[in-house]
């Protein structure tokens, strides 16, 4: 299944690369819009599991982590909006439809195979960090982009910890 995760991510990245070539902040805005979806999905499933009496020992830790991650991704999203990332209707249209698919896919995936859902999100966070690093290499230093890059790397470490907690 990890190969499927990589395949799906590679296809999505190729599409985004094509659509957003030379449009960095629009691409970043779409990535940040999408980046929140798994954390919302994970929280939804954790709340549902709790309501069904299926809470595990890691439950509260994971809920706190995912809430903090979703807030952090929202801060990134707002920054990209301030840089004009959501100016065009087509970008908002693409992002909202990708989010809809990605959210519901993550709800099902997290319910059925949470470690694999975390792995996919881990790969997405690594891709985001790589994208920001490439931007910095091409455009020079930008404190806010560097901060966001470091946040994405921190999210990837948190996702690794989550995978360990639910063994």
State what each model feature region is:
Residues 1-167:
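Non-heme di-metal
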């Amino acid at each position: 299944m990890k190969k499927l995760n990589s395949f799906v991510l590679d296809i999505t990245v190729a599409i985004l690369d094509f659509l957003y070539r030379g449009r960095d902040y629009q691409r970043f805005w779409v990535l940040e819009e999408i980046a929140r979806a798994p954390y919302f999905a994970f929280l939804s499933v954790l709340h549902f599991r709790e309501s069904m009496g299926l809470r595990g020992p890691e439950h509260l830790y994971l809920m706190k982590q995912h809430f903090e991650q979703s807030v952090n991704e929202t801060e990134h999203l707002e920054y990209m909006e301030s840089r004009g990332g959501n100016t065009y209707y087509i970008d908002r249209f693409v992002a909202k439809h990708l989010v809809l698919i990605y959210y519901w896919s993550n709800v099902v995936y997290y319910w059925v195979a949470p470690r694999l859902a975390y792995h996919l999100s881990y790969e997405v966070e690594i891709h985001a960090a790589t994208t920001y690093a490439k931007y910095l290499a091409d455009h020079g230093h930008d404190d806010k982009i560097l901060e966001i890059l470091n946040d994405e790397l921190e999210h990837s470490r948190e996702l690794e910890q989550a995978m360990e907690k639910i063994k």
